[in-house]
Amino acid sequence: MLSSIEAAEITKLAKEENLNADVFGPLAFDNSISKKSAGIKGIKNLVAGEADVLLVPSVETGNALVKMMIYFMGACAAGVVVGGKVPVVITSRSDEAQARLASIAAAVVALD
């Protein structure tokens, strides 16, 4: 799968750039958030089951994941696109005020 190849490339690039972060992939969602699932599948990595950030292969995948976290888990989501000249705040028309504020705060942090 293309997304698995891209995740492996991101992992390799992160190691080459010597980032101050643990980056590992590809990981299925369960292996990203559950040490038990990762252990059953024999995945041995610091990130497995402990991921703080999840990268997704498309905006549609990310949208579905975030909506599930909001509506099933009570999460507050912040949306910001980085990589351009300035960060771009991304919100949903149905976002609560807390999520809108979190998105603005994330964009401000991304400015540095």
Predicted regions and their residues:
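C-terminal functional extensions of proteins
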Residues: 68, 75-112
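Short, ordered loop/turn segments at secondary-structure junctions
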Residues: 28, 59, 93-95
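General beta-strand structural signal in soluble alpha/beta enzymes
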Residues: 22-26, 57, 82, 90
